[in-house]
Amino acid sequence: MEKKITPSELELNEFIKIINEMSGIDLTDKKNILALKLNKFLEGTNTKNFSEFLGKLKSNRQLKQETLDFVTIGETYFLRELAQLKEIIYYAKSLEKRVNILSAPCSSGEEVYSLALLAAQNFIKDMYILGVDINSSVIEKAKLGKYQGRTLQRLSESEKRRFFLESEDKFYTINKNELCTCKFELCNVFEEKFSRLGKFDIIASRNMIIYFDHESKLKLMERFHRILNDKGRLYVGNADLIPETIYFKKIFSPRGVYYEKV
């Protein structure tokens, strides 16, 4: 039987600190459930104890990525928070030019492809959507564009037929011929690579900021401000709390709330 590797309170706090430094994510409130889940994860890391794991985590690049993949895994689906997605497309169409959209984090691609199919339904062709995420496994899934039927439950049958190719194993693969250009990149929003992604008219950052501490939120707002075009908009999730900064002003519109670049 596999020996369980259980972290001490100090070791767990050190792990949470390392993850925060790497990604900005604050796992303090999830300490109890994290301790339980770590046992299973550590079985595949070839470490004798948690202290050895922490030592490797600080220097082993592959282990860093595997650990980030572990702590950021989550479920998502197509057309999530649909009203806001429609508002993004409504604004994009009003610009009457080529529109660049950033989805950060993009998870396994459902948000990016949801925006793309809504754009297609609104006859928007000149649009580029880039999805970035810190989790390597979800980025690979997004690039593949193959999904289980349950993630498409909010789509009509006609939408499924137009935008997906159904396989015999009951998986659905995105029909990219029907969509605007969608790309995906592995990227940490706090690393230098993020600043080189280009300029965007819209950033959709939904259900990520809620996991950041206050300092990381402020840093992220500055980074978002830097890559947005003038009057660019930031859309966040319903649970995301945005600190007041010099970079954005909060706008209340009949179609919902967004943040405009100052």
From Swiss-Prot:
A GO molecular function assigned to this protein is: protein-glutamate O-methyltransferase activity
- Entry-linked SUPFAM superfamilies: Chemotaxis receptor methyltransferase CheR, N-terminal domain (SSF47757), S-adenosyl-L-methionine-dependent methyltransferases (SSF53335)
A GO biological process of this protein is: chemotaxis
One Pfam entry name: CheR
Give the enzyme's EC designation: 2.1.1.80
Q: Enumerate the CDD domains for this protein.
A: AdoMet_MTases (cd02440)
Q: Does the keyword Transferase apply?
A: yes
Arranged from A to Z, the UniProt key words for this protein are:
Chemotaxis, Methyltransferase, S-adenosyl-L-methionine, Transferase
Q: Does the keyword tRNA-binding apply?
A: no
Report the Gene3D superfamilies cross-referenced here. Answer: Chemotaxis receptor methyltransferase CheR, N-terminal domain, Vaccinia Virus protein VP39
> This protein is called what?
Chemotaxis protein methyltransferase
